Amino acid sequence: MSQNDAAPGQQLWTGRFTEATDAFVERFSASVQFDARLALQDIQGSEAHARMLAARGVLTEAERDAILQGLAEIRQEVVEERFPWSPQLEDVHMNIEHRLTQRIGEAGKKLHTGRSRNDQIATDVRLFLREAIDTIRAELARFQHGLVELAEREADTIMPGFTHLQVAQPVTFGHHMLAWYEMLERDRDRLADCRRRLNQCPLGAAALAGTSFPIDREATARELGFDAPTRNSLDSVSDRDFAIEFCADASLILVHLSRMAEELVLWTSQQFGFIELPDRFCTGSSIMPQKKNPDVAELVRGKAARAQGSLVQLLTLMKGQPLAYNRDNQEDKEPLFDAVDTARDALTAFADMVPALSVNRERCRAAARAGFATATDLADYLVRQGLAFRDAHEVVGRAVRYATEADRDLAELSLEELQQFSTAIGDDVFAVLTLDGSVAARSHVGGTAPEQVRAQAQAARERLA
């Protein structure tokens, strides 16, 4: 039996061996159960390689055409989920090459000329990750669009800003949504930077030292949409920085979403009551009929652990390897795939859910009023009256203690009561102590004043355009 028609268990590299691979080792070392996900990228790289080999005279035009036709048929099998994957053939590369040779005969055996699985997998993963980054950046932008719309809708809605989860100063709900937007904007920028760095083509590096065939790496890189070939053949097959960098970026995305999720969970609770999530994004309890649980937000918060786990897996995987390809690197696919899926799905969930929430404006305003949120405004007022800030801070602290004992807000104290703490306080102080006056006073760039929120939202729209 020729190797082209190899029975399951007879790999395409058996010429040097005198006994068959142990059945357990075949199962243990096979990766096709997960790297089959790279099939379309593998075919794309093979098509470019075949065209380049023909252009350089390594393949005849007839061989090139047969290979391209065979690969097109295999692509259709993959897309239609009819491809006969075999774990005995180890990985996505050997499965596709074996299938190609079955279909077109001798020409299929020539496709691997001037190429190794080492540069092949490095190319496949870069192609895959480039597409994944484009998809994730699009979901980030979609979520950002939703946040901008929500910010504009709630530009005048006053809520408490917190430090240490204690009421600090009044802000607007729209301002808070634009803070989320900025977190995602940094994420989009980081992914664009990651994409730029990974967009170099390793194909042609072969096993580690390059190839003696007269290949044209620039042509292959151009056809595959890369900016240029990689510069060093040894580094080309050794490098997994781009995968680690992506997982770091994905981890940051999930950290940001997790922080948002924590706030959403708090805000939906009866103790806060700031927002209501649509029923379609919540679940109930098997025992408590009154429950409406923010499960989507909680799951996103939990999935941050998965993304961080993927990053640690890859860092640990690479830390002790000598240069060039080592079989350890087979283990890079699953954490990378999981990081891609986790980031994409979490963003999709939030891009759908968050813009659809409803805000309880009365509860938000009442919470801001209840926590002496305008105390800093009173201190600023006293500074404008000539007090040093530290003295003003002391005065307001005593006034807050007095109001707390009286179970009243600062704005509910009389002028006479306020003046017992400082004679610099005049009757114009009450405009300062209102929630609306507090947020309106912060009308500088980046401030929480409603007109600034609208201006920031418009600028955000323009950046997304």
Swiss-Prot record:
Which EC class is this protein assigned?
A: lyase
The places in or outside the cell where this protein is found are: Cytoplasm
Q: Which GO annotations describe the biological process of this protein?
A: arginine biosynthetic process via ornithine; L-arginine biosynthetic process
Species name: Halorhodospira halophila (strain DSM 244 / SL1)
**Enzyme Commission number(s):** 4.3.2.1
Could you tell me which cysteines form disulfide bridges?
none
**Any idea which UniProt keywords this protein has?**
Amino-acid biosynthesis, Arginine biosynthesis, Cytoplasm, Lyase
Family assignment? Belongs to the lyase 1 family. Argininosuccinate lyase subfamily.
InterPro entries given for it?
Answer: Arg_succ_lyase_C, Argininosuccinate_lyase, Fumarase/histidase_N, Fumarate_lyase_CS, Fumarate_lyase_fam, Fumarate_lyase_N, L-Aspartase-like
Q: What GO molecular function terms would the record report?
A: argininosuccinate lyase activity
Catalytic activity from the UniProt record: 2-(N(omega)-L-arginino)succinate = fumarate + L-arginine
Starting at the broadest rank, the lineage of the source organism is: Bacteria, Pseudomonadati, Pseudomonadota, Gammaproteobacteria, Chromatiales
Kindly list any coiled-coil regions of this protein. Answer: none
SUPFAM superfamilies per the record? Answer: L-aspartase-like
Give the gene that encodes this protein.
argH
Q: State the name under which the record lists this protein.
A: Argininosuccinate lyase
Write out the pathway annotation from the protein's UniProt entry.
Amino-acid biosynthesis; L-arginine biosynthesis; L-arginine from L-ornithine and carbamoyl phosphate: step 3/3
Q: What is its main location?
A: cytoplasm
Q: Which GO terms describe its cellular component?
A: cytosol
Signal peptide per UniProt: none
